[in-house]
């Protein structure tokens, strides 16, 4: 059963964006792109997320997005994943909130994106920075919701959902012609 449009609006994710790197000034519409990509994620994806299935009774959920540079994301990657190098996107799911009252804001987690890596990958892949940013925001949000791509079937499910969400906002299939996982 599809929820009414007003219910969808009431359940929209709150998005907090911190622009930490001046490099993002090269893409002045970055905040709008992030918000649009997050808003494009359908509620069924949120409601059936592993470990977050009960969030549907809460009308307020939020995600924080850090728009940073390669140096910052390399530090985060080293600290939290033991990989001392830049990457395009990192997702940090919030731990499940115990005993949250209906109406209380539920933090889903944080997403960090590095401008230099994102811009380089966009050029290498022949896509726009805007489209690549949209893809990585959706990818990061799906990680916060419990989706992953370590196993082939998980990767296929996650990539299929990414394609559907991105198509809804006019972004071409980021996996067309690719064999590798993101």
Describe every region a protein language model picked out.
Residues 1-133, 145-182:
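An acidic/histidine-cluster motif and surrounding catalytic segment
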Residues 138, 142-146:
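Short active-site segment of divalent metal-dependent hydrolases/proteases
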């Amino acid at each position: 059963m599809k929820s009414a449009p007003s219910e969808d609006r009431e359940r929209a994710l709150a998005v907090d964006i911190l622009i930490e790197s001046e490099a993002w000034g090269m893409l002045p519409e970055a905040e709008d792109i992030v918000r649009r990509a997050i808003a494009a994620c359908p509620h069924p994806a949120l409601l059936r997320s592993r470990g977050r299935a009960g969030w549907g009774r809460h009308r307020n959920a939020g995600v924080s997005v850090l728009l940073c540079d390669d140096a910052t994301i390399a530090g985060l990657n080293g600290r939290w994943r033991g990989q001392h190098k830049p990457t395009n996107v990192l997702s940090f799911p919030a731990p499940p909130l115990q005993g949250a009252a209906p109406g209380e804001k539920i933090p889903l987690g944080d997403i960090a994106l590095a401008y230099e890596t994102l811009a380089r990958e966009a050029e290498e892949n022949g896509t726009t920075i805007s489209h690549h940013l949209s893809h990585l925001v959706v990818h990061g949000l799906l990680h916060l919701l419990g989706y992953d791509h370590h196993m082939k079937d998980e990767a296929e499910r996650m990539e299929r959902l990414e394609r559907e969400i991105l198509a809804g906002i006019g972004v071409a299939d980021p996996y067309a012609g690719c064999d590798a996982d993101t």
